[in-house]
């Protein structure tokens, strides 16, 4: 049985168990059966894509600015989340978990990370941070343009982070420095998916593992994701908008 067929089979079994659940993150799901079923299905999905890992990956300091698969998956995950949030559709929440995990695996493959590592990092983060990261990924390939924040058209660095957190229900100031100052500083070892990642003159969103980020860098490039170079990674600091001071 494929992972997807297994997932479909478990939907009905899990639905009643989690009907009253309002989860902050996957680890808080009330149903042990739903939890175990989803973990098994996601592990199977990971095994299906891991074989592509080495051939498709890029190196540290390189970025992916053209990935329609990730863009479509991220938008689908956010759509499922909204159905759950607005209507309490628990099947939609299960779909959100599945598609979010698929998106994490694709990002991992393209950046040379272990899919399971990125999937776990996203699952353990706040739902707000998950949504912000996914929102930013829906804009991969959109051109950089200074002083702009227009979905599907153009972004500068703080325009992208503001847009992403806006879709998660959090308003941020406009400039990169103001955004960094408005959020609560986080030690690197405690940084989670969606956290603001700042160095002087530039701001990004953390994708939960090592120095993996999504950002809108400079003129002539697009919204992209990848890992920072070792030199650059040593300069960044992290901040969490959900615990702003």
Model-inferred region functions:
Residues 1-32:
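N-terminal secretory signal peptides that target proteins for export/translocation
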Residues 17-19, 34, 172, 176:
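Coiled-coil-like amphipathic alpha-helices with heptad-repeat character
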Residues 24-143, 230-245:
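Intrinsically disordered, low-complexity
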Residues 61, 170-229:
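...with weaker cross-activation on analogous glycine-rich loops/strands in unrelated enzymes
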Residues 140-193:
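Catalytic cysteine-centered active-site loop
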């Amino acid at each position: 049985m494929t992972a997807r067929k297994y997932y479909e089979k478990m939907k009905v079994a899990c639905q009643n168990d989690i009907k009253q659940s309002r989860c902050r993150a996957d680890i808080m799901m009330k149903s042990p059966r739903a939890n175990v079923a989803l973990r098994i299905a996601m592990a199977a999905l990971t095994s299906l894509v891991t074989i592509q890992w080495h051939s498709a990956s890029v190196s540290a300091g390189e970025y992916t600015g053209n990935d329609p698969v990730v863009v479509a998956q991220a938008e689908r995950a956010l759509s499922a989340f909204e159905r759950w949030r607005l209507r309490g559709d628990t099947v939609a929440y299960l779909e959100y978990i599945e598609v979010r995990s698929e998106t994490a695996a694709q990002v991992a493959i393209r950046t040379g990370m272990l899919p399971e590592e990125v999937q776990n990092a996203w699952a353990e983060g706040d739902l707000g941070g998950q949504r912000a990261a996914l929102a930013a990924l829906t804009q991969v390939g959109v051109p950089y343009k200074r002083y702009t924040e227009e979905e599907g058209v153009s972004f500068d660095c703080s325009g992208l982070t503001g847009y992403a957190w806006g879709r998660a229900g959090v308003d941020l100031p406009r400039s990169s420095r103001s955004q960094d100052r408005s959020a609560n500083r986080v030690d690197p070892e405690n940084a989670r998916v969606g956290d603001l990642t700042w160095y002087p003159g530039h701001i990004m969103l953390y994708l939960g593992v090592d120095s993996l980020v999504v950002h809108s860098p400079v003129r002539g490039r697009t919204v992209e994701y990848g890992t920072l170079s070792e030199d650059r990674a040593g300069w960044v600091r992290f901040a969490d908008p959900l615990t702003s001071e």
